[in-house]
Amino acid sequence: TNIYMVKVPYTAWAGNEASPVEVKDTYNFLDGLEQRYGVEELGTRERQLFSKLNSIGKNEEALFYQATDEMMGHQYANVQQRTHGTGRLIDKEVTHLSKEWDTKSKQSNKIKVFGMRDEYNTDTAGIIDYNSHAYGFAYLHEDETVKLGNSSGWYAGAVHNRFKFKDIGGSKENQTMLKLGIFKTMSPVTDHNGSLQWTISGEGYVSRNDMHRKYLVVDEIFNAKSDYTTYGVALKNELGYNIRTSERTSIRPYGSLKLEYGRFGSIKEKSGEMRLEVEGNDYYSVKPEVGIEFKYKQPMAVKTTFVTTLGLGYENELGRVGNVKNKARVAYTDADWFNIRGEKDDRKGNFKADLNIGVENQRFGVTFNAGYDTKGKNVRGGLGFRVIY
């Protein structure tokens, strides 16, 4: 008597639950998994992955479901959110150069080298928490007119941001972004002190990303790697009024609106096991913000000043940055796309606080900054060195 063992198709485990987003999502991934079965030669890492899956016993369905979930590329869920956040690092440093450091001449060039640590936490199922460490530089060229409060110029920045995901495998992503922009600041003719200022700016960016996705299958970590490009443009309007309360203190209430559009190209993992292909997608940001800044200056020595600024603000994302509906499929198969669950765009808004402490003179400065966002319980801190000439 001959006994034949027949492998049950992986699609038989798909179930009827809407997971991660729609009912067909798990089926489409498992269809790709089934198509990859037996493609790679014996002894390869992908064949070892299938051996791990096939070793799962009848009463160990939870292990199979966990392995399936691990392989489905949750790291690509909030690509747009991470890109948007990296761009804001440059924005923050350019703003510091523009507003926090007094210009002593009608034409100035300001450069700042900075490092920043960030953390993102969420309770949304399928979204992985992460830490990030960034370093880069910002440059600002400004030409002031004879009238106080009127100026124009351009700025540039570059940042390298390293993300470390808090998943089981310890996935990583590196992003390098370049940004270039122009701005113009105007003050009413009747405001001789230049206290009321309207600033309009436009910018564009491009970035290169390298993803190293690591995931657990039964009791072993497998991986896949990809690289991809993102790009975008933005327009910002800001209205602020500087109130000098004493020789050393000032208050600046402000309001702003920033519009941004960004997109990443299609992603196809080139190496590793159970490689995925992610469909290119975009995001748009519509972000109004209101806030107030408190500034204190204390002379320390000849031409040297201690400066501290506390900023309190409220912003609300009205665009589509988190719940972006990214899609993926198993690469090198003709399996259909499955959805990757995105972050909630809950419209709750974000209260933020930023503290900057620095020592500066007419040429050099050093600053320490720390901040907190209520949305995402985001804690950040950084250190910067700057020079003006």
Predicted segments, located by residue:
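Solvent-exposed, glycine/polar-rich loop segments of beta-barrel outer-membrane systems
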Residues: 125-130, 166-173, 208-229, 263-284, ...
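Extracellular/surface-exposed low-complexity segments
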Residues: 1-66
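Solvent-exposed flexible segments
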Residues: 258-262
